[in-house]
């Protein structure tokens, strides 16, 4: 993930410096004409003060960078429960808005189809001065029967390589064994197809028990 613009969070997460590798990857992808989405795992006390800087980096590298995706940390496998640090979607949104002058909490809303506690998003266009202007703040938000198809079309447009200077900021809170919510699982719009054709909600697919055992092992 693109977790910060300095090395400390990478040492905490990977045990080695990674920033230069990340920056080169962005440069090479941009040179190849690829659309780039920066994905950040948000860890309280490690990089939750870096969110605005990541958005600013994305703004400076438009139109190659099309989005920033924040994922509050989740815990899988065997992990000491007393050492877990949590951050919620509202806290992520508030920190981004506090750390970047062009971003406001009013710009964000939940996904059109998912449970409201699963995901969040906002869309921006860059004006002639370079500022990010919110598009979602003025758009009506309502449930729609064709929401899944609309989201797919919008992502194909937003994350396709182009000279269009637009940026999406969003994220998803993955569930783990300590905070699994069955109501969220029932509303999941991302299903993983098993070898036998069964559909498994995304968070359930990669969920592991407190002992580290996966409920649905294997890729498919």
Positions of PLM-derived features:
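Short, low-complexity, polar/charged sequence segments that are solvent-exposed and flexible
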Residues: 17-20, 56-59, 86-90, 210-212, ...
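Flexible glycine/acidic-rich beta-alpha junction loops that bind and position SAM and/or redox cofactors
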Residues: 8-10, 45, 65-91, 104-128
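Short, solvent-exposed loop/turn segments at secondary-structure junctions
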Residues: 5, 43, 75, 198, ...
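A general structural signal for short secondary-structure junctions and capping/turn motifs
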Residues: 57-61, 112-116, 182-183, 191-195
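Radical SAM/AdoMet-radical enzyme domain recognition
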Residues: 1-72
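Glycine- and acidic-residue-rich phosphate-binding/metal-coordinating active-site segment common to enzymes
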Residues: 95
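Radical SAM enzyme core and accessory elements
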Residues: 121-220
